[in-house]
Curated annotation (Swiss-Prot):
It is found in: Cytoplasm, Cytosol. This is Non-specific phospholipase C5. Belongs to the bacterial phospholipase C family. One of its GO terms (cellular component) is membrane. Residues 511-521 have a biased composition (Polar residues).
Amino acid sequence: MAETKKGSESYPIKTIVVLVQENRSFDHTLGWFKELNREIDGVMKSDQKFNPGFSSDLNSHNVVFGDQSQYVDPNPGHSIRDIYEQVFGKPWDSGHPDPNPGPATMSGFAQNAERKMKGMSSAVMNGFKPDALPVYKELVQNFAICDRWFASVPGATQPNRLFIHSATSHGTTNNERKLLIEGFPQKTIFESLDEAGFTFGIYYQCFPTTLFYRNLRKLKYLTRFHDYGLQFKKDCKEGNLPNYVVVEQRWYDLLLNPANDDHPSHDVSEGQKLVKEVYEALRSSPQWNEILFIITYDEHGGFYDHVPTPLDGVPNPDGILGPPPYNFEFNRLGVRVPTFFISPWIEPGTVLHGSNGPYLMSQYEHSSIPATVKKIFKLKDFLTKRDSWAGTFESVITRNSPRQDCPETLSNPVKMRGTVAKENAELSDFQEELVIVAAGLKGDYKNEELLYKLCKKTCVSDASKYVTKAFDKFVEESKKARERGGDENDIVFCVDDDDDHNVVKPPPSQSEPSHATPWSN
């Protein structure tokens, strides 16, 4: 592991650790934590939040937001079409698209859920009591949260995860098969750090989603990927964490290795275990007094939130528009999501509200991560117009000296799910996307019949095995390419499993997005 380079003299932070969980809104996860800290813009029994069962029906009953969330089995809608209805209270009409949908009333969550499945509004219109999430309860009490952090896109997982490290999704709002195979071409914060002489590391438990980015597939970055189980605690203990750390989760729910990404219908207690494990490893590290640990969620997953999504002043990052039928302009944000800041330089019980710039309409959103990384490490350039606009959160570091009272351990979460993992379940959209990326690396992307079978006819357990094998093959062949003296900027993928020299450099992609049409179910 390369030596961790000193950060900016203006800040005590030398290592930033990022963990991005899946598909939970702020109110669903932390709304009821207002009972612990009135500073939080959440919910209380004395100020009920609700949605009409159907916003177009004046006689429709109201669905009140409750605090009874435990194990959530249904997977609510969270496509760009679903979120339009959730935010504006009316369904998207492809025949008469509305360029000015009006205010973000946040009134369509219940009706969208019922449209998906009768009774689903009960899951969507409920949140967790603080005691149900004991790890988060202690983090809220001991460190900082932000109650004005929004997803970068009112869309699903993939585009929002792309924004986290590159401040753009390169025009994608859904499953862009061609770009998944080739890799998204935009510059990332990883390259900015590397160019400035800083180090980064990706600690994966399953297939690393950072391979969505084409440039992260280069030979020179192969050594930046580390097996979480083998390396993370070791690097923490030995003080060898790099300047920028990304912890990736288990995305597939298996009997022996349950998913810990918080995506419904995965057990949130497994995500709590992961957060606890990461925190305790960081807390025991000799680097603890130089660490800022950030936890956020990629998007809200269709769960209710009462804070209107920002509609004004949001810049398109790079001038690229989304594909038909939405032709999204990337000029409004997604729904509010939970975000934590953890460091001994933060006062306990801190709540970060709206951004203080750099522009009047700036907001905290996923592009705030590369924007703040740039600021703390004094990097040269922004990635896009979006991170140059996004609020930065270095102001959460307020102390003149590190605290000595940060808890060394966190509470043990209690299992919520009474059943076992559904290894034979169909794949979620995001799990399909991982399969497509894996097929690109393994060389199976040219076999249309096989690719369709992998995405639409494969269960969770088999998909997990496939992506793991594909990644292992990618690493193996990349090592061979390096040993043969391959250029460090080469990007390799396998074309024939029976050939020991099956590495080629893919042709460069066009800069414009392909907007490939995904398969229909």
